[in-house]
Amino acid sequence: MQNRTGLILCALSLLTGFLMICLGGFFISNSIFHSQRNLVVAYVLLPMGFVILLSGIFWGTYRQANENKEMFNHVLRQHLAFQDLPLATVDRPDFYPPAYEESLDVEKQACPAGRELLGFPPPLYTETNLEFEHLEDPQPEAPPPYQEIIADAGAPAKAQDAEEPSRVLKAGTALQLTELTGR
């Protein structure tokens, strides 16, 4: 019976708080009741309604927690009594990497250097690409001198100029002005 009475009182406090908030909002927004006395009543109803509503919410929450507290305590005590909490441990010496001095020992290395075991050094590479150099050709072919490249590139242009003069030279200065101005 006490459980039912507490539930009814909790619901009544929630409803009363909500109604007081609604009445305060109605008195403030309604233009018919714009007297000084109605505004005072409205501004008293609003905070009082919020206080009653919040106290009803907290009261209901406290009642529920208090009713179920004994059940939760019983289950928790029963669970803790039957077993100890498992503790996870870590084997520390295996967890950490080896010391610096141990890592320097060649005998203890798990993966020794492969090329050193075979007895020959890694292959030589060229500067331009990563292909293997041929052992019988230790020096790559030297590039031609700069003057030779210029002479080879200039020869076809001179032959073309000798066969036919350019358009600018044929037309003279008039063509140059039209090309510059775009007219």
Swiss-Prot record:
TM region(s), chain numbering: 8-28, 39-59
Keyword Mitochondrion in record: no
Protein's membrane topology: Multi-pass membrane protein
Alphabetical list of InterPro entries matching this protein: TMEM252
Main location: membrane
The entry's keywords: Membrane, Transmembrane, Transmembrane helix
Compartmental location: Membrane
CC terms in the record's Gene Ontology section: membrane
Protein name: Transmembrane protein 252
Organism per entry: Mus musculus
Gene, per the UniProt record: Tmem252
